[in-house]
């Protein structure tokens, strides 16, 4: 068994293909798992209403391919956030959470990544933060009962821009089912002290997103996606060296949005090769 598994985000693979094809392509490209996306689009939200036969079909494809789907990126809460002042939207956010946990149980998904936004399209204030806390408490109660882990991603907005900021919520929620899902690109873009941040959260890190970013500065808002590996602000060798020092044993997920590109498979193969090279330089072999 490999020490560290490397997976690929669903949105890096061609979009209009079957799940059986998606799993087979991920395997052919050298990945061990896929992270499923349940985003704010109606198309991907509809997966929460899959029939029993549709769920069984995907489960069989997982077993046949040997490629698992251990995690779900639940970014649908950007459109339907826990912190919304609209009661109907909050009710929808709870419904999405319930259905996401149910789907996870059926498919063997063990970790649901939550977006660290109280609201995204609304203005934040004390009320939205209060509603966000109520939503997280509700979600963790359900997840714990189903033995599904919830992991909050370090985000592209100040609200959850560091593990330090997440740690406040960890203290409030106080549950082993509430963890953190660092995105090394986002963590770096906010000019955090990477060693201090990783050390603070190492005992609650469920998995790690790998991507490059451009930093936030006094004159720039930064860039949080679609930055080619090696061209941004992330010091990957230093990052992997720190994880080796901290004895991190979890998985890595390469996060890319190449599903509509002309040669997405070539891009993800090259990305994986580059990441492995950085790991080898740091002595963190896969």
From Swiss-Prot:
Organism: Haemophilus influenzae (strain ATCC 51907 / DSM 11121 / KW20 / Rd)
Keyword Lyase: no
Chain ranges passing through the membrane: none
Additional observations: Probably part of a sugar metabolic pathway along with SgbH.
Gene coding for it: sgbU
Keywords of the record: Isomerase
PANTHER family documented for this protein: ISOMERASE, L-RIBULOSE-5-PHOSPHATE 3-EPIMERASE SGBU-RELATED
GO molecular function: DNA binding; intramolecular oxidoreductase activity, interconverting aldoses and ketoses; L-ribulose-5-phosphate 3-epimerase activity; zinc ion binding
Protein name (database record): Putative L-ribulose-5-phosphate 3-epimerase SgbU
């Amino acid at each position: 068994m490999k020490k560290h598994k490397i997976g690929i985000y669903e949105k890096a693979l061609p979009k209009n293909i079957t799940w059986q094809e998606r799993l087979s392509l991920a395997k052919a490209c050298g990945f061990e798992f896929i992270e499923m996306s349940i985003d704010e689009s109606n198309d991907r939200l509809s997966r929460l209403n899959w029939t029993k036969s549709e769920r069984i079909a995907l489960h069989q494809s997982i077993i046949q391919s040997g490629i698992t789907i251990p995690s779900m990126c639940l970014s649908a809460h950007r459109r339907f956030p826990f912190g919304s002042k609209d009661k109907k939207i909050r009710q929808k956010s709870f419904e999405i959470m319930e259905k996401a946990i149910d789907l996870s149980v059926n498919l063997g998904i063990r970790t649901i990544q939550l977006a660290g936004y109280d609201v995204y399209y609304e203005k934040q204030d004390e009320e939205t933060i209060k509603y966000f806390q109520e939503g997280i408490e509700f979600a963790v109660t359900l997840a714990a009962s189903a033995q599904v882990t919830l992991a909050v991603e370090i985000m592209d907005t100040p609200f959850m821009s560091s593990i330090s900021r997440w740690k406040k919520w960890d203290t409030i929620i106080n549950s082993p089912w509430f963890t953190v899902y660092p995105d090394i690109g986002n963590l770096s873009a906010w000019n955090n002290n990477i060693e201090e941040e990783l050390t603070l959260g190492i005992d609650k890190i469920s998995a790690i997103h790998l991507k490059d970013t451009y930093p936030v500065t006094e004159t720039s808002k930064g860039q949080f996606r679609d930055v080619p590996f090696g061209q941004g602000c992330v010091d990957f060798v230093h990052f992997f060296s720190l994880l080796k020092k901290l004895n991190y044993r979890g998985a890595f997920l390469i996060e890319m949005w190449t599903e509509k590109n002309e040669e997405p498979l070539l891009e993800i193969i090259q990305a994986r090769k580059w990441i492995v090279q950085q790991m080898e330089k740091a002595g963190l072999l896969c």
